[in-house]
């Protein structure tokens, strides 16, 4: 097994476990809070639209990747700090979504906080024992792919429809 995964598995912190489980259970609500905070911090409709489009594209990319790759989670053969989810391991969906949310807010005053949250999310997935570092890296890489697709789609849509976001 990956030595970084083994290192994180050996580490045990009550506070980190609590934070990681909170992120695991409430990711959808956290992303909604990120959107509302972004909405409150900016009046730029284009960046808000990009955030929403990127979340939708990220979920689609995640579904396709998990269906195509279908790798078993490390917790199917090793101990984890929470119950082992039944879906595929690669890529980390929580990491993809949180990184995608951060990318969509680049230029926003809240971007550094979102980026820190994305990093914490990735670490928490390995710490809980439900993803490997490769799963997290795949989530980050696919977040960039989703972001590029979202920006291109939004640009095409606004040009073709002559819509001012």
Label each region the model flagged:
Residues 1-31, 62-87, 161-165:
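N-terminal transmembrane-helix/juxtamembrane module of multi-pass inner/ER membrane proteins
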Residues 8, 36, 61, 65, ...:
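Alpha-helical membrane-inserting segments
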Residues 10-18, 43-47, 51, 124-132:
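Membrane-helix interfacial "entry" motifs
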Residues 20, 46-54, 110-113, 134-138:
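Alpha-helical transmembrane segments of integral membrane proteins
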Residues 31-34, 136:
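Transmembrane-embedded, aromatic-rich helix segments that form part
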Residues 33-61:
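Interfacial segments of alpha-helical transmembrane regions
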Residues 40-41, 78-165:
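Membrane-embedded catalytic cores of phosphoryl/pyrophosphoryl-handling enzymes
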Residues 50-58, 62, 66, 139, ...:
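Alpha-helical transmembrane segments in multi-pass membrane proteins
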């Amino acid at each position: 097994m990956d030595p970084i995964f083994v290192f994180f598995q050996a580490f045990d912190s009550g506070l980190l476990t609590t934070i990681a489980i909170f992120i695991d259970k409430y990711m959808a609500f956290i992303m909604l809070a990120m959107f509302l905070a972004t909405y409150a911090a900016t009046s730029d409709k284009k960046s808000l639209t990009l955030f929403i489009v990127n979340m939708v594209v990220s979920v689609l990319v995640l579904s396709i990747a998990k269906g195509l790759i279908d790798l078993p989670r490390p917790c199917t053969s090793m101990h984890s700090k929470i119950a082992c989810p039944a879906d595929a391991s690669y890529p980390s969906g929580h990491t993809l979504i949180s990184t995608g949310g951060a990318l969509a807010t680049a230029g926003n005053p809240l971007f550094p906080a979102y980026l820190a949250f994305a990093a914490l999310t990735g670490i928490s997935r390995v710490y809980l024992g439900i993803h490997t570092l490769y799963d997290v890296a795949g989530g980050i890489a696919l977040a960039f792919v989703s972001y590029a697709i979202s920006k291109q789609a939004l640009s095409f849509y606004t040009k073709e429809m002559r819509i001012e976001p």
